[in-house]
Amino acid sequence: MNFPPIHPSTPKMTPPDLDPQKIPQHIAVIMDGNGRWATSRGLPRIAGHRQGARTLKELLRCCKDWGIKALTAYAFSTENWQRPIEEVDFLMLLFERLLRRELSQMHREGVRISFIGDLTALPKSLQTEMERSMTETLNNQAIHFTVAVNYGSRNEITRACRQVAELVQQGKLSADAVNEGIVEQHLYTTDTQPPDLLIRTSGEMRLSNFLLWQMAYTEMYFTDILWPDFDREAFHQALLSYQKRDRRFGQVKALISA
């Protein structure tokens, strides 16, 4: 099945073979394969990141068109600082340029933008653009677009536990009152529902320290397609796979049906 290019004026049209009642409300993506995509074409790795950014933009609009309410993208992990300095510098500059160029359009389309991760380690100019984009789009409701930058799930969970421990130490919280809900209040994603579906491209089949707490019951879809080549049809296939699954959240089917 072929689809027309995504455009801001394109009306919302869910493919006819997808059940609108079973569309996942929150999708998370691990965008893997930019470097391999570029290398296979004799291009520098940064060309893959540039094309990968276009793919993410298209996916965001597709999610919006098809009624998906939240998209979370793993853009830069805490481990990615170990990449060549030229590549890291390019990625930081790319993030900043994309925000400056795309913010107005996303704001008009009703996109709410959020960032999760340790943003304090990022260049000051990038932090400024991130703060501006989050502030300007805070009340938008068409789709919640979250980008994980300098993010590591173990760091996030450790940070949350440390904050809860400080509350207990200060006498503001009883140790007996600490539960999953309390910890979740101190995660970066406190105002976002857990992902229904994780998509990872390029054939890798691991979580890579991404949303470990939040994805306890998330369905996972792995594809060999490299991220820059992940188009509407590939996304459509991921959603078809998701809709064929029986989500039980740790229960047996009889209890869910009751």
Curated annotation (Swiss-Prot):
Coiled coil: none annotated. Residues 1-18 have a biased composition (Pro residues). Mg(2+) binds at D32, E219. Substrate binds at residues 33-37, 45, 49, 77-79, 81, 83, 200, 206-208. The keyword Metal-binding applies. It comes from the Bacteria. Keywords: Magnesium, Metal-binding, Transferase. Residues 1-21 are annotated as: Disordered. The active site is at D32, N80. It holds the Pfam family Prenyltransf. InterPro entries: UPP_synth-like, UPP_synth-like_CS, UPP_synth-like_sf. Its EC number is 2.5.1.-. Belongs to the UPP synthase family. Homodimer. NCBIfam families: PRK14830.1, PRK14831.1, uppS. PANTHER family: DEHYDRODOLICHYL DIPHOSPHATE SYNTHASE 2, DEHYDRODOLICHYL DIPHOSPHATE SYNTHASE FAMILY MEMBER. Catalyzes the condensation of isopentenyl diphosphate (IPP) with allylic pyrophosphates generating different type of terpenoids. This is Isoprenyl transferase 2. It comes from Nostoc sp. (strain PCC 7120 / SAG 25.82 / UTEX 2576). The lineage of its organism: Bacteria, Bacillati, Cyanobacteriota, Cyanophyceae, Nostocales.
